[in-house]
Amino acid sequence: NNANLVAPFTNNSQYAEDVIDSLYPLEQLYAEGTSMNVSIDVMTDTLKRAGEKTDGSVVVFFISDGEITNEENLKSFKSAAKYVDGGAVLGYGTTEGGNMYMKSSYTGQDELIEDTSSYPRKPAVSVIDEDNLKSIADDMDVKYINMNDASNIDTTINKIKRESASESKDGKVSGYA
């Protein structure tokens, strides 16, 4: 598995939403387990370049279930922290786990993803690992929010907006993505 930058740095919030809507899981034929470690270098480099290109704040939302299934241990995300002005780690899933689905490129319908590491194949299950997610949040000095109880997200976003808003000469606020 590897990490790829799928969109350039932007302050266009509609573009950011469109990119998020276009994300999809790795084709199960090529999947080799999951690990957040593959994202560290790409993320750190992108955050560094973002800080060099703007006078505004660099905000990160790291969205994951936190699960590592490829036998690795979680590495430190501290290398990214010096480039982060705000954000949050958003954790999704439950400790009981849930079946994983992906949209079929043939039918457009959601299909159950299978765990190909066993025979007969079983449904692939996503299980939240809050210890990993909290560790990433601590490393980047941002808040961890379990999205099963998302009551803190509005407060966090409003705080980020207050702390990262920038005004142009004509008084317009910009810089949210």
Regions found by a protein language model. Name each.
Residues 1-48:
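Membrane-embedded segments
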Residues 2-3, 21, 25, 65-66, ...:
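Solvent-exposed coil/turn segments that connect beta secondary-structure elements
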Residues 10, 30-37, 123-131, 147:
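Soluble non-cytosolic domains of exported or imported proteins
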Residues 21, 25, 44-52, 138-141, ...:
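Sec-exported extracytoplasmic/periplasmic mature domains
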Residues 34, 96-97, 150-155:
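A short acidic, often aromatic-flanked loop/helix-cap motif at beta-alpha or helix-coil junctions
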Residues 59, 66-132:
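VWA/integrin I-like adhesion module and closely mimicked acidic/polar interface patches used
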Residues 130-164:
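Extended, hydrophilic extramembrane loops/domains of integral membrane proteins
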Residues 165-177:
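C-terminal signal-anchor/stop-transfer transmembrane helix together with its immediate cytosolic
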